[in-house]
Amino acid sequence: MGEKITEEREFQSISEIPEEEIDATNDEEKLADIVENEIEKEIRKSKTRKCKTIENFYYYILRDGKIYPASDYDIEVEKGKRSANDIYAFVETDVTRDFDEFLFDIDYGLPSISDILKFYLEKAGFRIANEVPTPNLKYYIHAVVEFGEDRPQYLAVNIYDIDSLARALRIPQIVEQKLGNKPRTITADEFNDIERIVAEEQPILAGYTYDEALRIPYHYYVDHNNSFKDDALKIAHAYLQLFPTPYQVCYEWKARWFNKIDCLKLERLKPSS
């Protein structure tokens, strides 16, 4: 893991991010460390503001390992100051105070269909009206932070390959049927139509659609509604068979920063029902 950042600093613009805090992006482990370091910075800033948690946020990691807020980078691209071709990974964070929800998110917290579809289409050469393209994006990173009463407790970083997710959801076949093979700019209506087919019309998990298959396990694992148990277990098994296993790194908060732990430790901490 990279050197810990012990000084609290506010970055007002992209150009103010110091070069010495940038790591090279060569593999998933380094991507996870980049994300972990960025979340630590957000936690330190929240403590400076006397906040007891952090907000959900979205970042891009570039091929050279630099990390930027996604909205800021999009603006820079639109102004012609940055290149969308440099975007290598997209980072989404979720923050929760519920340990069961934390475990659910790291086990079943796949990206939204909208995000997977957008990234796949742009990699395939399509453009989506009024969207900054990410033609070279390779990874979708989902980071989940679990907070206790006044401090963070655990962090899990899941790294998914975009192409593998798209294939599991049969997105290439549906795109070919609806749009053909010739890349072009597509409308919002065309995008929404494909998203609806992928999420709501194809029974891909134990006879359930993608949207249904995420709601049912949530009711069982997080809400502890046992009436969903049988279907939830069937869906969970099908889920593990269908979707690629992400590269996963887990951390526990110790004093001032996160330390890596065996992800199995988190499962052992789950209260027995």
From Swiss-Prot:
The keyword Electron transport does not apply. InterPro entries: ATV_ORF273. Keywords: Virion. The keyword Cell inner membrane does not apply. It is found in: Virion. It holds the Pfam family ATV_ORF273. It comes from the Viruses. This is Structural protein ORF273. It comes from Acidianus two-tailed virus (ATV).
